[in-house]
């Protein structure tokens, strides 16, 4: 059984809505201040500010093309703001050397691709790049960091396997191990459960919750609203490049707010396992119109 095995949801050790309402936190290490972010001169987000509470499990939710991943790319330094700034540990993140950022912040991007034929151990070892120096190459500390990351994700038995031989769930855990090998306190995850079956989704979410309880700040973009409500203690809800709400799951995941964000009629009930909010869709009428597209079918 992987070493990250966590208490059953709803047990005393598991986070509850009450726990989430009053987390012990310091000043935010990571925040966006009045940022404008976009691509090729076309802004997706304009004048947005957001704080990531230190020690939190923050989840960013919202419909497709609302700016969730764009915000995460800005927070990770992959996308430079056209205006405003992203601040990491009191400094503008774009002014910091890439290796310095990588020693403080780890990122799991969407649809990461491994080099052909690379083994699990070699891929996870790439997480140590930020710790290499001209006069300090691979060391026993690097070896320990890789082994600990493999062990934490339950992928140590796969170390000698080629990544392209693994299942989708195994491959995603290997990518998480690579990020853990960076040994950062901040982890940014862009849709980490996409394309996984429900069992692998829950397994990964339990791993992230375990890492959060172990002291890491987690920031994840998720499509599954009920995963967000169950595992996060801080939710940022977006629509059309704006933040509509932020706060605890009980504050953000309400029936009226969910309909405002997604246009989805719904009922929010008590999760029978955690006691937190659980969204039950009422359904929406079928339409031949493609959401988010213009009359020609081209995405808006």
Task: Write out the residue ranges for each language-model feature.
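Conserved ABC ATPase "signature" region
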Residues: 125, 140-158
């Amino acid at each position: 059984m992987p070493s990250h095995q966590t208490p059953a949801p709803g047990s005393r050790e598991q986070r509850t809505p009450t726990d989430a309402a009053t987390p012990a936190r310091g000043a935010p290490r990571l925040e966006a201040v009045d940022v404008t972010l976009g691509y090729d001169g076309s802004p997706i987000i304009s004048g947005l500010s957001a704080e990531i509470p230190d020690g939190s499990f923050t989840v960013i939710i919202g419909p497709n093309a609302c700016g969730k991943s764009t915000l995460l790319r800005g927070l990770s330094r992959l996308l430079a703001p056209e205006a405003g700034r992203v601040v990491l540990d009191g400094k503008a993140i774009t002014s910091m050397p890439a290796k310095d950022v990588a020693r403080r912040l780890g990122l799991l991007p969407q649809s990461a691709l491994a080099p052909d034929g690379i083994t699990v151990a070699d891929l996870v070892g790439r997480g140590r790049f930020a710790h290499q120096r001209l006069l300090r190459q691979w060391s026993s500390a690097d070896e320990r960091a890789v082994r600990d990351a493999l062990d934490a994700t339950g992928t140590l038995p796969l170390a000698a396997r080629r990544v392209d031989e693994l299942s989708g769930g195994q491959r995603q855990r290997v990518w998480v191990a690579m990020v853990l090998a960076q040994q950062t306190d901040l982890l940014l995850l862009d849709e980490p459960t996409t394309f996984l079956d429900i069992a692998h989704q829950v397994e990964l979410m339990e791993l992230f919750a375990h890492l959060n309880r172990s002291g890491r700040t987690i920031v994840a973009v998720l499509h599954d609203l009920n995963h967000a409500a169950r595992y996060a203690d801080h939710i940022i809800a977006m629509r059309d490049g704006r933040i509509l709400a932020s706060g605890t799951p009980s504050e953000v995941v309400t029936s009226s707010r969910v309909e405002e964000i997604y246009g989805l009629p719904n009922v929010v009930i008590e999760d029978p396992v955690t006691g937190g909010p659980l969204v039950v869709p009422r359904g929406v009428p079928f339409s031949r119109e493609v959401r988010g597209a213009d009359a020609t079918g081209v995405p808006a």
